[in-house]
Amino acid sequence: KIVEIGCGKGYFTELLEKRGFKNIYGFDPAYEGDNPNITKDYFSEKYKSINADLVILRHVLEHIEKPYEFLTHIQNATSKDTKILIEVPDFEWIVENRAFWDIFYEHCNYFDATFLSSFFKNATSKKVFGTQYLLMLASLDELRKPYVKHRYQKNIFKESFRNIKDFLSQNTPLVLWGGASKGVTLLNIFDKNRQLVEYCIDINPKKQNKFIHFGKDI
């Protein structure tokens, strides 16, 4: 039995089914489909038993304010033999690529390989998606309180900010390509007065002819 917590629209659960896996379940309050195996709710301590062989968290843990407590709820609802597969953005990649747009309000926590692995006594991890994400497999019965060791400089994005500000000071017409979280984060930082960007381009038809929260046309 596989349970994906935070399964979104159910794409990954459907992919697993197509690959031949059986007994796949999910949790997500935003799910809009009609799969009876997906519970339209947040997973919480009220779910006492999910009896899973594998629990999957794909791009969920970085949105959880208290990740250790959340993992404890999952541990309490499963057996000692349950495995957990976690995928999160890799903070080391963010730092190396100066990808400051990947730091935004929806992410409560950031993980590198050392920090993520510290949640468990033993864990196997690797970098995926061009080293942008971390994928880790562990046993839930080996969950432990993590330790944090800060090893990053405070001003790692300072030079990137300076270069962008220098470019923006040229007063050339600008268009935002992509009206999702990264584009909005860019505007939050560099266009607080809503004067630099004329409009936004986005491939999502549900966004077109509407506005992002800055009042810019899409």
Show where each model-derived region lies.
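Conserved SAM-binding loop
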Residues: I2-R98, Y105-K121, A138-L140, V184, ...
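Alpha-helix initiation and N-capping motif
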Residues: L57, A113, T131-Q132, R194
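Aromatic-acidic/polar surface patches that form glycan- and anion
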Residues: N109, K127, G179
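Conserved S-adenosyl-L-methionine
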Residues: N122-Y133
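Hydrophobic, well-ordered beta-alpha structural blocks that scaffold small-molecule cofactor pockets
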Residues: L134-I218
